[in-house]
Amino acid sequence: MNTQMTPALLEPWALPTAGKIQEIATREGIDAATTQLYQSVSESPQHGAFIRRVDEISTRTPPRKWQAGAPLIIVPGAFYRENPRSGADGRLLREQAERLDCPTGIIPIVSCGTLKQNARIICDWLLDQGQPVILASLSKGGADVKMALAEPDAAEAFKNVAAWVNLCGILNGTPMAEWLLSRNPAALLNRLYYTFRGQGLGFLRDLGYGPGRPLDCALQLPHHIRMVTIAGFPLREHLSSALARRCHRRLTYLGPNDGSLVLSDVCALPGLLYPIWGADHYLRPQTDVNQLVLSILQYLDEELQWRLCPQS
């Protein structure tokens, strides 16, 4: 599932810093920097064992049915109501969970709501739950969860959250938000397109990247929550659409990226990371994401079962 690359030039146990990766990108090119960052993640003690475990689980047939007793609850991405075909509603996650007979649900956040607005909705929803749950967020939904974790009553709200699957989450903002709100002619055309579809982009002001922005804060992840992040690690040759290539190129000055996320930021997140070689922010071109999601859910089921279903 995770294609092996040529030997890395960095020690496999040391994840390079953002500065080091940018130096490599300047000296050797963005593709070389992306390759080395990917290899460092894949070969690190923290993430490598997890990646190998997930890959081993993917070879099992048929998949074992869900044992943990906790439902998978989706925190959807932007436009999940207006454009469910985009996958922002978490359909892929729900379908794989249902293959395991895992119950699913969705937190009804505002499709284009502010971070503060959706953070409150998430906390209120979780406060009403009396059982363990596993959260799974998509893209902007990850930012909404991050801000929910900063709410005053987050400790109480998240006490029953056993794990969090962060699928391409924009946890630190994205430089693309500023570009999309700029006076660039292409950005103006993009905004006009969304306006005609009745889809406002005002929420992008919350997703700005850099010092002083709303997401320029530490992720306050409770120790009891097991976090798993899934993100794409593409080279330029992997990007099959003109839009994906333009987005990737605009972020190249920050180092390896998926067209929306800066990958050195992704690597600095707590928890475990599964890097998908060759995929962009929307996990394109076509990869076997279905099998990967199924395997990660099985991994969480095995890891959490003893804690969520104690034996008498």
Give names to the regions the model predicted.
Residues 75-78, 139, 169, 232:
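Glycine-rich His-Gly loop
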Residues 1-85, 95-99:
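Flexible, membrane-associating and regulatory peripheral segments of lipid-active enzymes
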Residues 73, 105, 163-165, 228-230, ...:
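Hydrophobic/aromatic beta-strand patches that form the interior of the parallel beta-sheet core
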Residues 64-133:
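Active-site catalytic motif of lipid deacylating hydrolases and related acyltransferases
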Residues 116-219:
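Serine-dependent carboxylesterase/thioesterase catalytic core
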Residues 222-312:
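C-terminal catalytic-base region of ester-bond hydrolases, centering on the histidine
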Residues 86, 175-180, 238-243:
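Short aromatic-enriched loop/helix-cap "lid" or pocket-rim segments at secondary-structure transitions
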Residues 97, 126, 220, 292-293:
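A generic structural signal for well-ordered alpha-helical segments
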